[in-house]
A protein has these predicted regions:
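Structural/interface elements that position substrates and couple domains in central-metabolism enzymes
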Residues: 1-193
């Protein structure tokens, strides 16, 4: 069923990691998951395989990757690192970890300082990743529909989009072949999982 995520690889990696887990470990998932998966799927799996208890023996956080291939290090410095824990203490530990290993660009355009942003729970961090990628998916699809319409009525869509994006409430992407890639078309379906 293409509407459901295939967790087999993540499950196998989690089992392998959990079999070797030692007390005091911080586990961080850096991927894209349906909301609730870190807590509802991976916490119980880690506990079952390791025999340890999350929040007491180890901590789990979800911290989505927000980088593009070919510009990973630049993106790590450019964008806030989102961290959501399964417990307050685990989230604080995850924040301290990422603050210790990442450096961030100065950005005056953000609502708060660039750096590690605690999300108040793994579910909020999972949803943030889905929301930003779904926004991109919808925006690309919308731009493509504008282009189709403009072509049908003889209007230069590039000029229209440039005009729309001249004010701060519009962020229309450029139209292209379609919404593509290995991730963006798939992520909106994770709301249904």
């Amino acid at each position: 069923d293409e509407s459901r995520p295939d967790f087999r690889v993540m499950d196998a990696a989690t089992r392998s990691m959990a079999a070797r887990l030692t007390p005091g470990t911080l586990v961080s998932y850096e991927t894209t998951l349906p909301v609730g998966t870190t807590r509802g799927r991976y916490k119980p799996l880690i506990e079952e395989v390791s025999g340890l208890v999350e929040g007491r023996d180890f901590d789990v956080v979800f911290s989505p990757e927000r980088v593009l291939t070919g510009r990973v290090f630049a993106d790590l410095a450019r964008y806030p690192k989102l961290v959501g824990g399964l417990s307050e203490s685990g989230e604080a530990r995850g924040v301290r970890f990422y603050e210790a290993v990442l450096a961030f660009d100065q950005r005056d355009d953000l609502p708060r300082p660039n750096g590690v942003w605690p999300m108040g729970g793994a579910e909020a961090a999972e949803m943030a990743k889905l929301a930003e990628t779904t926004y991109r998916d919808v925006n690309i699809g919308l731009a493509n529909q504008f282009a189709r319409y403009a072509d049908a009525v003889g209007i230069d869509v590039a000029r229209v989009i440039e005009a729309c994006n001249s004010q701060p409430y519009s962020h229309i992407h450029r139209p292209g072949i379609a919404v593509g890639g290995h991730c963006i078309p798939v992520y909106p379906r994770l709301y249904l999982a």
